[in-house]
Structure formats: C-alpha cells, structure tokens
C-alpha cells in the first residue's frame, strides 16, 4: 500500500486522540461544535437521502455518522487505523452501516473512480504533504455532476 502522501507524525498525532474522538468536551470538541454547520452546508446543496458519499480524512467518523444518520450511504476513509477502529465501533454501537476504510484518497480514486455522488474532505488538506493530490483524487472519485466539499484552515 502506497502511503506517499501521508505524514507519520500526523497519523501518530490523531492516533493518540483516538479514544477521545467521541468526547464532545475533549480535545476534538471543536469538530463536534462545527459538525451541525458542516452538515447543514452540505445538505443545503444536495439531498443526502440515499446519496453515496465518501468522507475523506474521516478520523473517528463524526461527520461520516451525521451523513449516515441523514440517510446517505456513507464511506469513511482515513489512514489512522486507531481512529478508523473507533469510528467502526461507534457506528456499531449506534446501529449504523458505514463502510470505513484504512486507505488514502489516491488509493480509493484508483480503485473506484467516479463512484460517489459526493465527496467531503473537511480539515484534512492541511495534514498531508501534497494537498493537490488529494483534491485531484476527490475530483476523480465523484460521479459526473456530483459535488466535492472541502473545508480547511485559512
């Protein structure tokens, strides 16, 4: 598995917080606070019901679960295995069917081009050495006429 667009220190940083992804008052609380705004922004552009959506850089699945709860067929992608494990367990606890994968946007785009109605990539681009590669891969993942949603630090 190629991980050329991954920084080990970034993976380690998020792996250290893996057990705290779902602590709404913990170190990742800002993600919980902005999640309703994110979801409303996405929902304002597409009807989430039955849409096939990939959440690139999903971490512990905060946005991914919100998308699934809104009716989307959600896939969460991240390279932090500990975060993906937390996301999988939380989805099971909440009776949600979400396809979580330990892979990169680039690898998913090579394996499944033009296979999603929408892509989300929130606060992830600042954590990779080559953001343009992720953007290109997200564009390759979305079906013609689909949507790609990005958010990153200014």
Where would I find each of the regions flagged by the language model?
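Conserved short-loop catalytic and cofactor-binding motifs
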Residues: 2, 26-30, 122
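Conserved acidic
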Residues: 7-8, 27-30, 59, 79
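Conserved SAM-binding loop
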Residues: 39-46, 51-153
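Conserved SAM-binding loop and adjacent beta-strand
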Residues: 23-42
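Soluble or luminal CAZymes and related metallo-dependent hydrolases
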Residues: 6, 34-38, 130
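N-terminal, positively charged/glycine-rich alpha-helical extensions of SAM-dependent methyltransferases
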Residues: 1-22
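A short secondary-structure junction motif
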Residues: 21-24, 49
């Amino acid at each position: 598995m190629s991980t050329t667009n991954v920084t080990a220190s970034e993976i380690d940083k998020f792996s250290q917080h893996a057990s705290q992804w779902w602590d709404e008052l913990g170190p990742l609380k800002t993600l919980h606070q902005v999640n309703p705004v994110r979801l409303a922004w996405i929902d304002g552009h597409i009807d989430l019901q039955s849409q096939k959506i990939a959440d690139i850089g999903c971490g512990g699945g905060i946005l991914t679960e919100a998308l699934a709860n809104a009716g989307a067929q959600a896939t969460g992608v991240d390279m932090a295995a500990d975060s993906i494990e937390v996301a999988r367990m939380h989805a099971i606890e909440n009776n949600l069917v979400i396809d979580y994968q330990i892979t990169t946007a680039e690898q998913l785009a090579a394996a499944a081009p033009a296979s999603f109605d929408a892509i989300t990539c929130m606060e992830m681009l600042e954590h990779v050495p080559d953001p343009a590669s992720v953007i290109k891969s997200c564009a390759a993942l979305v079906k013609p006429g689909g949507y790609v949603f990005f958010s990153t630090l200014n």
